Regions:
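Short beta-strand segments
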Residues: 59, 82-87, 129
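A short, N-terminal "cap"/entry segment at the start of jelly-roll beta-barrel domains
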Residues: 1-45, 136-178
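Conserved, surface-exposed functional patches that form binding/active-site neighborhoods
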Residues: 122-141
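Ligand-binding loop in jelly-roll beta-barrel domains
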Residues: 79, 99-126
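Short acidic-glycine-tyrosine-enriched beta hairpin
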Residues: 70, 84-100
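Short, conserved beta-strand element in jelly-roll/cupin
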Residues: 45-55, 63-81, 118-122
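Conserved short histidine dyad/triad with adjacent acidic residue
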Residues: 28-36, 49-65, 99
Length: 178
Protein backbone atom coordinates (compact mmCIF):
# COMPACT_ATOMS: atom_id res chain seq x y z
CA UNK A 1 0.00 0.00 0.00
CA UNK A 2 1.33 3.44 -0.85
CA UNK A 3 0.09 6.82 0.34
CA UNK A 4 -0.89 9.51 -2.16
CA UNK A 5 -2.17 13.03 -1.52
CA UNK A 6 -5.69 11.69 -2.18
CA UNK A 7 -5.51 8.55 -0.06
CA UNK A 8 -3.89 5.11 0.03
CA UNK A 9 -3.44 3.12 -3.18
CA UNK A 10 -2.80 -0.61 -3.49
CA UNK A 11 0.08 -1.37 -5.85
CA UNK A 12 1.19 -4.82 -4.75
CA UNK A 13 -0.14 -8.31 -4.44
CA UNK A 14 -1.53 -9.85 -1.30
CA UNK A 15 -4.33 -9.04 1.05
CA UNK A 16 -5.13 -5.60 2.41
CA UNK A 17 -7.77 -3.63 4.29
CA UNK A 18 -8.70 -0.07 3.36
CA UNK A 19 -11.74 2.00 4.29
CA UNK A 20 -13.51 3.61 1.30
CA UNK A 21 -13.58 6.94 3.13
CA UNK A 22 -9.78 6.82 3.42
CA UNK A 23 -9.19 5.64 -0.14
CA UNK A 24 -8.73 7.86 -3.17
CA UNK A 25 -11.67 8.58 -5.45
CA UNK A 26 -11.96 9.49 -9.10
CA UNK A 27 -14.15 12.47 -10.02
CA UNK A 28 -15.74 11.81 -13.41
CA UNK A 29 -18.07 14.76 -14.06
CA UNK A 30 -21.38 13.41 -15.46
CA UNK A 31 -20.27 9.90 -14.48
CA UNK A 32 -20.18 10.80 -10.78
CA UNK A 33 -17.31 9.71 -8.56
CA UNK A 34 -16.02 6.26 -7.82
CA UNK A 35 -13.62 4.39 -5.58
CA UNK A 36 -12.14 1.23 -7.08
CA UNK A 37 -9.50 0.41 -4.44
CA UNK A 38 -6.89 -0.32 -7.15
CA UNK A 39 -3.62 1.35 -8.04
CA UNK A 40 -1.59 0.93 -11.22
CA UNK A 41 -1.92 -2.83 -10.92
CA UNK A 42 -5.54 -3.87 -11.49
CA UNK A 43 -7.06 -6.83 -9.72
CA UNK A 44 -6.65 -9.66 -12.25
CA UNK A 45 -10.00 -11.43 -11.84
CA UNK A 46 -12.50 -9.07 -10.25
CA UNK A 47 -13.26 -5.37 -10.45
CA UNK A 48 -15.14 -3.62 -7.65
CA UNK A 49 -16.24 0.02 -7.46
CA UNK A 50 -18.35 2.17 -5.20
CA UNK A 51 -20.08 4.73 -7.42
CA UNK A 52 -21.52 7.95 -5.99
CA UNK A 53 -23.87 9.53 -8.52
CA UNK A 54 -25.43 12.97 -8.35
CA UNK A 55 -28.94 13.49 -9.74
CA UNK A 56 -29.06 12.27 -13.36
CA UNK A 57 -25.42 11.11 -13.36
CA UNK A 58 -24.65 7.70 -14.84
CA UNK A 59 -22.13 4.97 -14.09
CA UNK A 60 -20.94 4.91 -17.70
CA UNK A 61 -22.23 4.52 -21.23
CA UNK A 62 -24.72 1.84 -22.31
CA UNK A 63 -22.61 -1.25 -22.97
CA UNK A 64 -22.24 -4.99 -22.72
CA UNK A 65 -19.27 -6.96 -21.46
CA UNK A 66 -18.12 -10.51 -21.99
CA UNK A 67 -17.88 -11.02 -18.23
CA UNK A 68 -20.68 -11.00 -15.65
CA UNK A 69 -21.41 -7.93 -13.55
CA UNK A 70 -23.48 -7.26 -10.45
CA UNK A 71 -24.81 -4.00 -9.01
CA UNK A 72 -26.23 -3.30 -5.55
CA UNK A 73 -27.96 0.03 -4.92
CA UNK A 74 -26.83 1.07 -1.44
CA UNK A 75 -28.71 4.38 -1.29
CA UNK A 76 -30.98 6.51 -3.44
CA UNK A 77 -32.96 5.70 -6.57
CA UNK A 78 -31.75 4.84 -10.06
CA UNK A 79 -32.98 3.94 -13.49
CA UNK A 80 -31.56 0.74 -14.91
CA UNK A 81 -31.55 0.56 -18.70
CA UNK A 82 -31.16 -3.13 -19.53
CA UNK A 83 -31.74 -4.71 -22.94
CA UNK A 84 -33.37 -1.40 -24.01
CA UNK A 85 -35.91 -1.52 -21.16
CA UNK A 86 -36.13 0.78 -18.14
CA UNK A 87 -36.44 -0.54 -14.59
CA UNK A 88 -36.58 1.63 -11.48
CA UNK A 89 -34.21 0.66 -8.68
CA UNK A 90 -34.18 1.65 -5.00
CA UNK A 91 -31.87 0.93 -2.08
CA UNK A 92 -30.97 -2.73 -1.70
CA UNK A 93 -32.08 -3.70 -5.22
CA UNK A 94 -29.53 -6.05 -6.80
CA UNK A 95 -28.99 -6.37 -10.56
CA UNK A 96 -27.22 -9.38 -12.08
CA UNK A 97 -25.97 -9.00 -15.67
CA UNK A 98 -24.81 -12.23 -17.30
CA UNK A 99 -22.06 -11.82 -19.93
CA UNK A 100 -23.34 -10.00 -23.02
CA UNK A 101 -26.23 -8.17 -21.29
CA UNK A 102 -26.51 -4.51 -22.46
CA UNK A 103 -27.02 -2.18 -19.48
CA UNK A 104 -26.35 1.11 -17.71
CA UNK A 105 -27.45 2.67 -14.40
CA UNK A 106 -28.43 6.34 -14.04
CA UNK A 107 -29.25 8.14 -10.78
CA UNK A 108 -32.81 9.46 -10.61
CA UNK A 109 -33.40 13.14 -11.35
CA UNK A 110 -33.40 15.17 -8.16
CA UNK A 111 -31.73 12.45 -6.09
CA UNK A 112 -28.21 11.11 -5.52
CA UNK A 113 -27.43 7.39 -5.45
CA UNK A 114 -24.67 5.09 -4.24
CA UNK A 115 -24.11 1.87 -6.20
CA UNK A 116 -21.69 -0.98 -5.54
CA UNK A 117 -20.50 -2.50 -8.84
CA UNK A 118 -18.69 -5.83 -9.11
CA UNK A 119 -17.58 -7.53 -12.31
CA UNK A 120 -15.39 -10.29 -13.64
CA UNK A 121 -12.51 -9.03 -15.73
CA UNK A 122 -13.36 -9.46 -19.40
CA UNK A 123 -11.08 -10.52 -22.20
CA UNK A 124 -10.61 -9.16 -25.69
CA UNK A 125 -10.39 -5.67 -27.13
CA UNK A 126 -11.18 -3.13 -24.42
CA UNK A 127 -11.61 -5.93 -21.88
CA UNK A 128 -14.50 -7.34 -23.90
CA UNK A 129 -16.64 -4.18 -23.60
CA UNK A 130 -18.80 -3.01 -26.50
CA UNK A 131 -20.53 0.39 -26.25
CA UNK A 132 -23.94 0.29 -27.92
CA UNK A 133 -26.36 2.74 -29.50
CA UNK A 134 -29.69 2.84 -27.65
CA UNK A 135 -32.58 5.29 -27.95
CA UNK A 136 -33.65 4.41 -24.41
CA UNK A 137 -30.16 5.04 -22.97
CA UNK A 138 -29.87 8.23 -25.06
CA UNK A 139 -32.83 9.71 -23.12
CA UNK A 140 -30.52 9.53 -20.10
CA UNK A 141 -27.41 10.80 -21.91
CA UNK A 142 -25.91 7.30 -21.76
CA UNK A 143 -25.75 6.19 -25.41
CA UNK A 144 -22.85 6.45 -27.81
CA UNK A 145 -23.50 7.92 -31.26
CA UNK A 146 -21.85 4.98 -32.97
CA UNK A 147 -21.17 1.45 -31.70
CA UNK A 148 -17.55 1.00 -30.61
CA UNK A 149 -15.15 -1.06 -28.51
CA UNK A 150 -12.92 1.99 -27.97
CA UNK A 151 -13.49 3.59 -24.55
CA UNK A 152 -11.71 6.77 -25.69
CA UNK A 153 -14.35 7.19 -28.40
CA UNK A 154 -17.25 6.21 -26.13
CA UNK A 155 -16.24 8.73 -23.46
CA UNK A 156 -14.65 11.43 -25.64
CA UNK A 157 -17.14 14.13 -24.57
CA UNK A 158 -16.77 13.27 -20.88
CA UNK A 159 -12.97 13.15 -20.97
CA UNK A 160 -12.75 16.43 -22.89
CA UNK A 161 -14.67 18.22 -20.11
CA UNK A 162 -12.60 16.79 -17.22
CA UNK A 163 -9.52 18.43 -15.71
CA UNK A 164 -6.22 16.68 -16.36
CA UNK A 165 -6.07 14.94 -12.97
CA UNK A 166 -9.36 13.74 -11.57
CA UNK A 167 -8.17 11.77 -8.52
CA UNK A 168 -9.49 13.27 -5.31
CA UNK A 169 -9.90 12.44 -1.64
CA UNK A 170 -13.24 11.19 -0.34
CA UNK A 171 -15.96 13.88 -0.18
CA UNK A 172 -17.45 13.97 3.32
CA UNK A 173 -21.05 12.78 3.33
CA UNK A 174 -20.85 10.95 -0.03
CA UNK A 175 -21.42 7.53 1.49
CA UNK A 176 -24.49 6.74 3.59
CA UNK A 177 -24.24 5.60 7.19
CA UNK A 178 -25.64 2.09 7.29
Amino acid sequence: MRETKNGPVVDGEGWFVVNAQDSRWREMGPLGAYCNFEGKRRFPQLGININVLGPGERIGMYHRENAQEGFLVLAGECTLVIEDQERQLTAWDFVHCPPGTPHIIVAAEGQSAVVLAVGGRGRGVGGGVRYLVSDVAARHGASVGEETTDPSAAYADVYAALPRSTWAPYRDGSLPSL
